[in-house]
């Protein structure tokens, strides 16, 4: 019964069935904002006996305060964010967004979704151009997205960076900075992202670049040093 309900939820949230033969556990890949968390919460409420775990445990039921279990070697029914570490035995399903992990060979999914309520069309166009993906936005509103000169323009909102040399430089100039890794699963209205080079990071550090560019909900200001280095010559 839990498998049937899961398949119904995947269909209702427009997940696409792949050509992989049906097997257990069901592998489900979806971009942030596609409904993965909501699906997990709904199946947890419908079948409270299920053991649902994650490497970054999230809330399952706001009324009871029930959270996902922290992953150990013990078997689970559902594993969220399965690329986060060594997997125990999983019976029913594994969920993940491969774009948020540096994994060259994630499991072949049974179901996928690139439809998002999280990112507007401006953000999806940016992400698709950088990462070569095909994310589609379901949002009607538009966020504010700008490319700023890091040498002449002050940041707005929360300053985010993940490269240590960039973090050190910002701190030397008295600019408070939040490492991208500390913002996992969070969104902030206005974000200023400082990075060395989008082109190089899209090859060598795709996961952290993706996370850095997807923390905002209203405005994203990108400060890319290499894009403006000629201005200092």
Swiss-Prot record:
Residues 1-134 form the (+)RNA virus helicase ATP-binding domain. Its main location: host cell. One of its GO terms (biological process) is symbiont-mediated suppression of host innate immune response. GO terms for molecular function: ATP binding; RNA binding. Pfam families: Viral_helicase1. Residues 135-233 form the (+)RNA virus helicase C-terminal domain. One of its GO terms (cellular component) is host cell cytoplasm. Keywords: Host cytoplasm, Host-virus interaction, Inhibition of host innate immune response by virus, RNA-binding, Suppressor of RNA silencing, Transport, Viral immunoevasion, Viral movement protein. PROSITE patterns: PSRV_HELICASE. It is found in: Host cytoplasm. It comes from the Viruses. TGBp1, TGBp2 and TGBp3 seem to act together for cell-to-cell propagation. TGBp1 is the main movement protein that physically cross the plasmodesma with the viral genome. TGBp2 and TGBp3 would facilitate TGBp1 function. Belongs to the Tymovirales TGBp1 protein family. Homodimer and homooligomer. Interacts with capsid protein. Interacts with host AGO1; this interaction targets the host protein for degradation, thereby suppressing the antiviral RNA silencing. Transports viral genome to neighboring plant cells directly through plasmosdesmata, without any budding. The movement protein allows efficient cell to cell propagation, by bypassing the host cell wall barrier. Increases plasmodesma size exclusion limit. Acts as a suppressor of RNA-mediated gene silencing, also known as post-transcriptional gene silencing (PTGS), a mechanism of plant viral defense that limits the accumulation of viral RNAs. This is Movement and silencing protein TGBp1. It comes from Narcissus mosaic virus (NMV). The lineage of its organism: Viruses, Riboviria, Orthornavirae, Kitrinoviricota, Alsuviricetes.
